[in-house]
């Protein structure tokens, strides 16, 4: 598996780090854009990458401003800058990959940015796997205990020097405002394909409230999946293989429909 990293400019000229993985010998049919969540960065999902590459994906993961290896103030420009950075990255991918299909896996904070991206760029008919979306309040702190249920997962997070233990108050307020606006007028999701995945013990996303909200969205055949005992990062938990398999299964099913 090949792994490279580089930088790309967002629409305002800020340099954002991204990395990508691919199997050049096996080849790939699709590109998965992985958008990190609260407390995380582009390298926070080590189990997801090989599973997607084995399924003939190229995986591209950016660091939002101030997170991971991206320089600058954490969350500079707010959710709007994140959404526009996703568009800039998609254009960069298209220039390199041509007609290969792009799909998005968006976690937590990244899910709010991805939904705003779809609203701002309605011509994009990209399918979206939404994981633990922060739609009902945004915390400032992101402790390992909030993200993880099992001890190994907690230790991996606490040992990560790029773990973002907190975000600025202004970013939290902006994310919260954006989430409320997205839920108040979800018409931009009319006919789109999205699936929602959440841990049943997530302290930040009440899954029953999320299920009710998803049921009101004008999506085409929405999917809602919960995972017992998982917290805010179900991708990295003990049942991460089942979570990732659920992503891949949904993408395959909806590709054919």
What are these regions (language model features)?
Residues 101-127:
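Conserved hydrolase catalytic core segment
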Residues 196-198, 202:
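Short beta-strand/loop motif that positions the catalytic acidic residue
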Residues 38-41, 67-99:
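Catalytic nucleophile-loop/oxyanion-hole region of alpha/beta-hydrolase
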Residues 223-257:
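Catalytic active-site module of serine/aspartate enzymes centered on a nucleophile-bearing elbow/loop
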Residues 49-73:
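Conserved alpha/beta-hydrolase
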Residues 1-23:
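N-terminal cap/lid segment of alpha/beta-hydrolase-fold proteins
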Residues 39-47, 59:
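Serine-hydrolase catalytic-loop signature spanning alpha/beta hydrolases and amidase-signature enzymes
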Residues 206-215:
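Short alpha-helix in the alpha/beta-hydrolase fold that links the catalytic acid
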């Amino acid at each position: 598996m090949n792994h490279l990293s580089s930088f790309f400019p967002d629409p305002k000229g800020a340099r954002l780090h991204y990395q990508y993985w691919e199997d050049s010998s096996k080849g790939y049919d699709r590109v998965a854009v992985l958008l990190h969540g609260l407390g995380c960065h582009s390298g926070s999902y080590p189990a997801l990458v090989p599973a997607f590459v084995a399924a003939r994906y190229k995986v591209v993961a950016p660091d939002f401003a101030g997170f991971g290896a991206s320089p600058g103030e954490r969350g500079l420009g707010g959710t709007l800058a994140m959404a526009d950075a996703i568009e800039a990255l998609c254009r960069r991918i298209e220039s390199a990959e041509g007609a290969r299909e792009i799909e998005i896996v968006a976690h937590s904070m990244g899910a709010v940015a991805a939904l705003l991206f779809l609203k701002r760029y309605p011509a994009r008919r990209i399918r979206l796997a939404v994981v633990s979306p922060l739609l009902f309040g945004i915390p400032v702190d992101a402790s390992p205990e909030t993200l993880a249920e099992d001890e190994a997962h907690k230790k991996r997070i606490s040992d990560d020097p790029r773990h973002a233990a907190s975000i600025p108050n202004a970013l939290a307020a902006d994310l919260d405002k954006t989430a409320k606006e997205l839920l108040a007028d979800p018409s931009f999701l009319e006919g789109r394909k999205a699936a929602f995945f959440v841990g049943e013990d997530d302290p930040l996303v009440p899954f029953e409230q999320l299920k009710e909200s998803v049921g009101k969205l004008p999506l085409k055949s929405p999917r809602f999946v919960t995972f017992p005992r998982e917290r805010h990062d179900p991708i990295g938990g003990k049942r991460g293989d089942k979570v990732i398999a659920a992503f891949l299964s949904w993408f395959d099913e909806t590709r054919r429909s």
